[in-house]
């Protein structure tokens, strides 16, 4: 048990150091693979072309917004590209984790 608490503490410290690496409270299973965290550091490498492509895709799905990244769909499209996972990854993610990811994306794009 002490080892588990130590690992959790290390993960929390890592999250504080790099807010783009989000550690989940509980393991999340997607398409048979278990995830304990998601790394959104890929946001730092995205370009204006990515922004245009994502916003066009969102318009095509019927999402209407002046700030697409503020919508869950938009934030998850940015997160999916950054993390290298399909956007469907976020569909069944627990709501607390989903909101955390959305906030991280918004904060990154608006900072």
Locations of regions flagged by a protein language model:
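Short, surface-exposed, charged amphipathic helix/loop patches that serve as local interaction elements
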Residues: 2-111
């Amino acid at each position: 048990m002490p080892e588990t608490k130590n690992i959790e503490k290390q993960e929390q410290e890592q999250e504080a150091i790099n807010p783009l690496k989000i550690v989940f409270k509980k393991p999340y299973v997607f398409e048979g693979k278990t995830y304990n965290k998601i790394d959104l550091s890929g946001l730092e490498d995205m370009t204006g072309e990515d922004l245009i492509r994502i916003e066009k895709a969102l318009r095509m799905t019927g999402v209407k917004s002046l700030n697409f990244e503020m919508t869950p769909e938009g934030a998850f499209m940015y997160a999916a590209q950054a993390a290298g996972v399909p956007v469907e990854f976020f569909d069944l993610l627990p709501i607390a984790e989903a909101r955390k990811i959305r906030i991280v994306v918004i904060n990154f794009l608006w900072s």
